[in-house]
Amino acid sequence: MSGAFYVFTALLLVASDQIAAESGKRLEMYKHDVMAASNAVVKSLPNRFLRGSRDEPDNLANEERTVYSVLASMINEGVSKMPCAAEVVEKISHTTEAVENMPRAAKAVKKRPRGAKAGRKMPRAAEAEAVKKVPRAGTAVKKAPPLAEDVKEMPRAKEAMEELRRAADATEDMQRAKANDLLKALIGADEALKKHWTPSGNTAAIGDTSYDVFNKVILSLPEWKINFRGMKSMAVLDQHRENIDLVHKTFEILCDKNVKPTAAEVSFIWSMMEWKGPNPEKYHRRNLVRQAQRYVFLDLRNVKKR
């Protein structure tokens, strides 16, 4: 469930200087072989906590209730809003069936000229019937069976053309369904976000981390960009220590100096940031949020398919 880690990191860098894992010192990656993807986010949320910005227990409790309940509810409802996978599978099966019929259709279409030729020969068949009494009648009768066979091919050719048309329509419908499914998913997730996030942000005390999360992380899900490059971890060798130090330094600038991600986590976070921008802090934040959006969206789709 990679998206959960990315969105958590984005919240850390964008919204709060106090988000961390159970140790209060470091983030922890999700282990794909430990938790099922469909339950990774919701099950792990209660096991994490949001440190109080003023180290007050009441403040901590408020943040924990507000932020994690919002995230869990948003994810649950967002998943429930996803289009039914069965409908998509059914459309794909229709398309597959139509495509399987295409070779037969093509073969029948090849015979179509014979059918047309047979149609042109039909008057000759009548003439053959009329001249049965002449010596050449026997020859005309011999030609009749192939003629009848060609005439029989005409309905098959028409049926084949219908199969080709249905295959084309099914392919077009499937492409249109994918676009509609994507739009429905985004709209549903956006509705869930507004429903669960807005009330919690309005009720949170000014200055609390949960209030800052609500006010600083403004995501319009239908505008999510999903064409980012794939995440790649780098081998954490001694020569990469400069990169690790740079990420830690960035964490101190944007977050809390005590937040120290592991070397493996740094390798992912490094690829999420935008180091070449003219304003690194600004571009770091923007790129992290976009990466989080992309991977959470992909995770939601994967959860629905399971």
Curated annotation (Swiss-Prot):
Family statement drawn from the similarity comment of this UniProt entry: Belongs to the RxLR effector family.
Domain of life (superkingdom): Eukaryota
Residues annotated as signal peptide: 1-21
Region (Disordered): 105-142
Name of this protein: Secreted RxLR effector protein 76
Entry function: Secreted effector that partially suppresses the host cell death induced by cell death-inducing proteins.
Keywords: Host nucleus, Secreted, Signal, Virulence
Localization: Secreted; Host nucleus
GO cellular component: extracellular region; host cell nucleus
Major localization class: secreted
Chain span(s) of sequence motif RxLR-dEER: 48-65
Composition bias, Basic residues: 107-123
Domain notes: The RxLR-dEER motif acts to carry the protein into the host cell cytoplasm through binding to cell surface phosphatidylinositol-3-phosphate.
